[in-house]
């Protein structure tokens, strides 16, 4: 069973030189970083590897709200300034989810349990402030690709991305108490209290059975890397 908060992962490489520090300092002053500046919200939650559900990790989503029905998140292993970037997650409304093909829907997970169980938390943000957003998130679906498996000790991003699943209240989707306790102590919160506070949040009337595919069908999706012939002919519009 793998439990990871990602606080001790440092990739190999030499220290920054004076010249690289100057480049960074100059870029900070002279360049515009508009996409990054749109990441306004920090979410602490958990995820499970779709191909190996014994591996549960803590994640830190930094959220860019593109509009009221589409969020895009940079996912880090911790909230430190040197935290490894371990993946990306896209979050869409239930309305947008229903426009997807069934094959595409299978790659997404629901968020209702994450919200209701208290595992989806906004560190340092009062629950009363987060409440309206939680009601919306409970009805959304997410697609999370992990690109760096630091919980298995990878010092660099290795192999193909892994499709991640959302914790659920059954089977191998149950949250591990050790990891929840570590998160709660770090942010001085109580997941159990959050669960109690959110009891009045309405669950979706219907969660599409194509989502949380492992839970509904006992199967998962993994990527493999294969060598193929290059397409040497340009495609005309």
UniProtKB/Swiss-Prot annotation:
Short name of any one Pfam family annotated for the protein: DUF1264
InterPro entries per UniProt:
OBAP-like
- Top-level taxonomic group: Eukaryota
The family this protein is said to belong to: Belongs to the OBAP family.
Q: What is this protein called?
A: Oil body-associated protein 2C
Annotated source species: Arabidopsis thaliana (Mouse-ear cress)
């Amino acid at each position: 069973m793998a439990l990871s908060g990602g606080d001790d992962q440092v990739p190999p490489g030499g220290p920054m030189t004076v010249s690289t520090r100057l480049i960074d300092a100059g870029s900070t002053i002279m360049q515009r970083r508009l996409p990054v500046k749109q990441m306004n919200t920090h979410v602490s939650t958990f995820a499970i590897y779709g191909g190996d559900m014994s591996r549960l990790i803590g994640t830190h989503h930094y959220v860019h709200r593109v509009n009221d029905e589409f969020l895009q998140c940079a996912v880090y292993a911790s909230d430190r300034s040197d935290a490894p970037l371990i993946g990306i997650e896209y979050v869409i409304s239930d309305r947008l989810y229903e426009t997807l093909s069934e094959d595409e829907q299978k790659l997404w997970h629901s968020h209702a349990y994450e919200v209701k169980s208290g595992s989806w938390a906004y560190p340092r943000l009062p629950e009363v402030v987060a409440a309206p957003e939680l009601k919306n998130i409970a009805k959304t679906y997410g697609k999370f690709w992990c690109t760096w498996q630091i919980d298995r000790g990878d010092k660099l991003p290795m192999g193909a991305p892994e499709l991640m699943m959302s914790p659920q209240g059954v089977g191998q989707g149950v949250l591990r108490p050790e990891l929840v306790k570590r998160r709660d102590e770090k942010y001085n919160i109580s997941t159990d209290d959050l669960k109690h506070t959110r009891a009045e949040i309405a669950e979706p009337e219907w969660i599409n059975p194509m989502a949380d595919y492992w839970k509904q069908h006992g199967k998962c999706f993994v990527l493999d890397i294969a060598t193929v012939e290059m397409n040497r002919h340009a495609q005309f519009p």
